[in-house]
């Protein structure tokens, strides 16, 4: 193990244990730092004190040249800067090659959303009369009905369901718990999945010693993965003409449709689990068709 590899491990442990960052965030930082170490290794750099500002700038340029999105490049730079800052603070390194490197502002893109009609078509389509079909319907209803992140959905345990009170207890980013209200249609889909035996049928495939507390199970009776949720969204989206449907698109659509329906921005911030209301404000965009309609209806010379 090289010195830099050991340093990266210590930093990731710090993020996980002392900073209490979510497993998904730590995993993303791990991937970024592995790419960073591999890039430096090709240059013969194996220790933190040998890293120069030029090395870091070239790594960023390399990531951009590989086609990484601005947000991904900025996250990688944040991981690298955090690593070197940590090493200096801990007395492991005496050089701080990233001190003069500023993180560029990422271009804000409006989130991809589907229309209300498309959402209804997605959720009202006939689902297979199987345990997996009942599960898939519930997955889509909860994603759109509660605005959950995919990691929040897959992390749900049965004890987190408070269906009589009509809310879910969700573990969000930074291990912060919040209450998420649930729609009537999502409640009915969950009831069909849970009370009518679909989950029990999937649970029957699990090994006796490996009974899972998860709400959503795969064909082996274990917790449904993020990748499986992605596949569910793509498959059922495609059947109603929505190509490349992503779980986060349903979260974006939930937020956009809630605001269009008159939801308060602060309330929506709480439901979505955003630490900063500026993150929620991106959903205040209005599509061009609606903008034109409002303009024509309101302007005296239109």
For each of these PLM feature ranges, what is it?
Residues 1-302:
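Conserved catalytic core of the tyrosine transesterase superfamily
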């Amino acid at each position: 193990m090289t010195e830099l590899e050991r340093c990266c491990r210590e930093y990731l442990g710090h993020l996980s244990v002392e900073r209490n960052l979510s497993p998904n965030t730590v995993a993303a930082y791990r991937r970024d730092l592995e790419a960073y170490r591999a890039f430096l290794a090709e240059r013969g750099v194996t220790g933190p004190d040998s890293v120069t500002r030029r090395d870091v700038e070239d790594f960023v340029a390399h990531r951009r040249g590989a086609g990484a999105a601005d947000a991904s490049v900025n996250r990688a730079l944040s991981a690298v800067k955090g690593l070197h800052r940590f090493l200096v603070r801990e007395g492991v390194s005496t050089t701080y090659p990233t001190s003069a490197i500023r993180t560029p502002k990422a271009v804000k893109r409006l989130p991809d959303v589907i229309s209300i009609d498309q959402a209804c078509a997605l959720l009202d389509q006939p689902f297979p009369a199987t345990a997996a079909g009942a599960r898939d319907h519930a997955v889509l209803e909860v994603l759109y009905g509660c605005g959950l992140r995919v990691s929040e959905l897959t992390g749900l345990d049965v004890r987190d369901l408070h269906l009589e009170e009509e809310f879910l207890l969700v573990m969000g980013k930074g291990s912060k718990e919040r209450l998420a209200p649930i729609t009537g249609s999502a409640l009915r889909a969950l009831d069909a999945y849970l009370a009518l035996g679909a989950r029990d049928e999937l649970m029957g495939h699990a090994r006796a010693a490996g009974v899972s507390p998860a709400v959503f199970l795969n064909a082996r009776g274990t917790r449904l993965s993020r990748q499986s949720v992605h596949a569910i969204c793509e498959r059922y989206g495609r059947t109603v003409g929505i190509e490349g449907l992503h779980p986060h698109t349903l979260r974006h659509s939930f937020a956009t449709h809630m605001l269009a329906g008159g939801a308060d921005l602060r309330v929506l911030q709480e439901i979505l689990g955003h630490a900063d209301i500026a993150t929620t404000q991106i959903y205040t965009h209005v599509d061009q068709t609606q903008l034109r309609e409002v303009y024509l209806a309101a302007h005296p010379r239109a």
